[in-house]
From Swiss-Prot:
It comes from Aspergillus fumigatus (strain ATCC MYA-4609 / CBS 101355 / FGSC A1100 / Af293) (Neosartorya fumigata). It comes from the Eukaryota. SMART domains: Pro-kuma_activ. The gene is sed2. GO terms for biological process: proteolysis. This is Tripeptidyl-peptidase sed2. Secreted tripeptidyl-peptidase which degrades proteins at acidic pHs and is involved in virulence.
Length: 602
């Protein structure tokens, strides 16, 4: 034991010596303070700061291969998900050399408050020490409109011996934030009254579904019928709340009374991370959280539902569609995912719905890839990660922010991450059509996965040379599927409202996946897990193909017909719905009866 400690000490000493003797190199750098921000003041060298380092993972390729095998319905390993955080991390742990190198570098700077967490190293220090360590210049910057302050640096450096082991250090050079994927809440139309709507629901009357969506509309439209889940069968579903939004117990009770009488009495649990709250009296916006909760309960009741409430604000590179980081608040993916991944298997929800997003180009590539990798890790634990595709159609700010100022159809993040299932939007019911704001397109960061290759190639062949140069034809295509995205009846702060957006689509589809998991668990089968390989193969016949309508965008305005944003106009830009997969509605909307039959065959 003593000998091993001596060896470790010697190694740390050597690492420290090497780290300090090799010139540091710039690891990340901004050319200027991002748009919408300005210098506020310089912190004291004694001010505290907390940073975390993402270490390079040992066998990412092997991990991704294992995940694809357990998600492929034709593979013998289908459904054999990792059962613990430790088992899942086994292939992703950094090398001992990486851990010792980075830790030694920190300790040589006098930093002692260090936490090793698998492939992350987190530490607390002071601004003065951080500046010296990273050759940085941390200052306080303030948003010019919202007056939100952030402690950031425009550049930081790492010694060469450390840089080779590191993916990123955060928070450092990134300023930023975003919005939920829904339109501004509007009061109920004159022709829709809560009591009249409730009477229609009680009578099973769905004649008003083109004007207002209720859970019964979705149950009828998506062929759920009288399927009854078992609340004790093991299926669990969750939704993520950010930006100080909290679902309300009273609103859920009123929703159940008026619009989902079969769910009366069902409640939800709340798990809080990173200072997230469960404030039932907040004057802040609660619409997104209430929407997610009410339609997950309304469609999947009585399956248990959890809200993950995560505090904090995330990271952004501003572009024209999100110039004001206070108005467009970026959710703290890292804090949320690191905590959820550590949950015990018997408590981990097998479906997590998230209705937030942003332009892919506003996210630093290293950060985006690290977060997408965390979603893959959830998939390996048997979790279906569901995201709304976005509400900017073809795009809102159709201009690159990399200095080239090219006209471009901007993909969405995390919707274009290949390890999530992205849900676009439809409208009307007889038949359904693609809704104009349903985001879709092709990632600039991720190549197209093999599981969607043939479906997307068929679409691209039909598209031909149209829009050539405005999108990446080799990128991961999204959305994967779609669901209704307009006119959802939601109770918020005691009042009936209607919401639009793919924020509506994601919880509706998530609830259907939770029902599929319920059926599989009751038949002693594993849960669905990462869905996409199954969706594009065995399940492709379980969707209603949407062939009318299309998404629009690139009209020089912010999403939902908003204010001018100064970006280029692409006349008649649109992704049209068509036979097979398309960038407006993916594979189509779910037919639960068909999907249930297909899901039970393996």
């Amino acid at each position: 034991m003593f000998s091993s400690l001596l060896n470790r000490g010697a190694l740390l000493a050597v690492v420290s010596l090497l780290s300090s003797s090799v010139a540091a190199e710039v690891f990340e750098k901004l050319s200027a303070v991002p748009q919408g921000w300005k210098y506020s003041h310089t912190p004291s060298d004694r001010d505290p700061i907390r940073l975390q380092i993402a270490l390079k993972q040992h066998d990412v390729e092997g991990f991704e291969t294992a995940l694809l095998e357990m998600s492929d319905p034709y593979h013998p390993n289908y459904g054999k998900h990792f059962q613990t955080h430790e088992e899942m991390k086994r292939m992703l742990l950094p090398t001992q050399e990486a851990v010792e190198s980075v830790r030694g570098w920190l300790e040589s700077a006098g930093i002692s408050d260090i936490e090793e967490d698998a492939d992350w190293i987190k530490f607390r220090t002071t601004v003065g020490v951080a500046n010296d360590l990273l050759d940085a210049d941390f200052k306080w910057y303030v948003n010019e409109v919202g007056h939100v302050e952030r402690l950031r640096t425009l550049a930081y450096s790492l010694p060469q011996s450390v840089a080779s082991h590191v993916n990123m250090v955060q928070p450092t050079t990134r300023f930023g934030q975003i919005k939920p994927n829904r339109a501004t809440m509007r009061g109920r139309p004159v022709q829709v009254d809560a009591d009249i709507l409730s009477a229609a629901v009680q009578a099973g009357d769905t004649s008003t579904c083109d004007q207002v969506i209720t859970p019964q509309c979705l149950k009828d439209l998506y062929n759920i019928g009288d399927y009854k889940a078992d609340p004790n069968g093991g299926s669990k579903v969750a939704f993520a709340s950010f930006l100080e939004e909290y679902a309300r117990y009273d609103d859920l009770a009123k929703f159940e009374e008026k619009l989902a009488p079969y769910a009366i009495g069902q409640n939800f649990s709340v798990i809080q991370y990173n200072g997230g709250l469960n404030d039932q009296n907040s004057a802040s916006d609660s619409g997104e959280a209430n929407l997610d909760l009410q339609y997950i309960v309304g469609v999947s009741s009585p399956i248990p539902v959890t809200e993950f409430s995560t505090g904090g604000r995330g990271l952004l590179i501003p572009d024209l569609s999100q110039p004001d980081p206070n108005d467009n608040s970026n959710e703290p993916y890292l804090e949320f995912l690191q905590n959820v991944l550590k949950m015990d298997q018997d408590k981990l929800p097998q479906v997590i719905s998230t209705s937030y997003g942003e332009d892919e180009q506003t996210i630093p590539e290293k950060y985006a890839r690290s977060v997408c990798n965390l979603y893959a890790q959830l998939g390996s634990r048997g979790v279906s990660v569901i995201f709304s595709s976005g509400d900017s159609g073809v795009g809102a700010a159709c201009l690159t922010n990399d200095g080239t100022n090219r006209t471009h159809f901007p993909p969405q993040f995390p919707a274009a991450c290949p390890w999530v299932t992205s849900v676009g939007g439809t409208t009307k019911t007889q038949p359904e059509e693609a809704v104009y704001f349903s985001s879709g397109g092709f990632s600039d960061l991720w190549e197209r996965p093999s599981w969607q290759d043939s479906a997307v190639k068929r679409y691209l062949k039909k598209l031909g040379p149209r829009y050539k140069g405005l999108y990446n034809p080799k990128g991961r295509a999204f959305p994967d599927v779609a669901a209704q995205a307009e006119n959802y009846a939601v109770f918020d702060k005691g009042v009936l409202h209607q919401f639009d957006g793919t924020s509506c689509s994601a919880p509706a589809f998530s609830a259907i996946v939770a029902l599929l998991n319920d059926a599989r668990l009751r038949a002693h089968k594993p849960v669905m897990g990462f869905l996409n390989p199954w969706l594009y193969s065995k399940a492709s016949k379980g969707f209603n193909d949407i062939v009318k309508g299309g998404s629009k965008g690139c009209d020089g305005r912010n999403r939902f017909g908003g204010t001018p944003n100064g970006s280029p106009v692409v006349p008649y830009a649109s992704w049209n719905a068509t036979d097979g997969w398309d960038p407006a509605t993916g594979l189509g909307t779910p037919d639960f009866g068909k999907l249930l039959s297909l899901a039970m065959r393996r």
